[in-house]
């Protein structure tokens, strides 16, 4: 146990940073592919975070297995947030991923990045970061609309979103993210069993 704690507390090496960067790129692609179908439809866009969470679990968990040290997940989330922001997403979408990545890093760290259950919970929390923009949409729809119009979103798209939005959609969005990311984490644990055993990750 002491060796695991010491390993976790050691600073990130150049190799760790390179690995984190590579997996961040892969994770971004998988989240993008999973969510793009929903993002293009103003009615289904609320489920973009759920779609994004469906495919990326194995990549996320493999990153933890490769670099089971503090700050790797946080760095991944910050980089992803920056990419989302510069590609025209709402600032709250980017910020949501950044904040939840830090929270997810802390949760996985509680188990020294060796617990399948905590690592899976960490992924679920990270996936909830994608709801940031939609939370702002429900809290301040006019402000959200102005920001997105400035980012190039069409008025008709926003009008359809506002006509569709209700409390039921908000609740369904959170439930869907939790379900899809939990499934993705479960599949990831099954797929990466050998890698987890090598890294000393247990239930």
Question: How would you label these PLM feature ranges?
Answer:
Residues 35-40, 44, 80-110:
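Interfacial aromatic-anchored transmembrane helix boundaries in multi-pass membrane proteins
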Residues 29, 97-135, 185:
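Short helix-perturbing small/polar motifs within transmembrane alpha-helices
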Residues 45, 120-193:
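Membrane-embedded alpha-helical hairpins and interfacial helices in multi-pass inner-membrane proteins
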Residues 1-35, 148-157, 161-172, 197-203:
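Membrane topogenic helices and adjacent juxtamembrane segments
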Residues 34-42, 67, 71, 107, ...:
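Membrane-interfacial segments
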Residues 2-71, 75:
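Hydrophobic transmembrane alpha-helices
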Residues 17-22, 50-51, 70-78, 94-95, ...:
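Hydrophobic alpha-helical transmembrane segments
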């Amino acid at each position: 146990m002491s060796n695991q704690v010491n390993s976790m507390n050691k600073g990130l090496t150049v190799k760790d940073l390179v690995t984190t960067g590579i997996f961040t790129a892969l994770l971004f692609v998988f989240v993008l592919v999973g969510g793009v179908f929903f993002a293009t439809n103003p009615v289904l866009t609320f489920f973009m975070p759920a779609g994004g969470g469906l495919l990326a679990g194995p990549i996320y968990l493999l990153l933890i297995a490769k670099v089971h040290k503090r700050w790797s997940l946080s760095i991944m989330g910050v980089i992803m947030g920056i990419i989302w922001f510069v590609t025209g997403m709402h600032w709250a979408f980017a910020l949501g991923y950044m904040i939840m990545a830090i929270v997810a890093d802390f949760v996985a760290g509680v188990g020294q990045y060796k617990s399948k259950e905590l690592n899976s919970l960490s992924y679920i929390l990270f996936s909830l970061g994608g709801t940031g923009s939609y939370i702002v949409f429900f809290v301040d729809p006019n402000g959200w609309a102005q920001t997105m119009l400035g980012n190039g979103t069409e008025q008709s798209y926003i009008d359809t979103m506002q006509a569709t939005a209700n409390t039921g959609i908000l609740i369904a969005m959170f439930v869907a993210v939790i379900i899809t990311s939990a499934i993705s984490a479960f599949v990831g644990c099954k797929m990466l069993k050998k890698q987890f055993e090598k890294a000393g990750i247990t239930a």
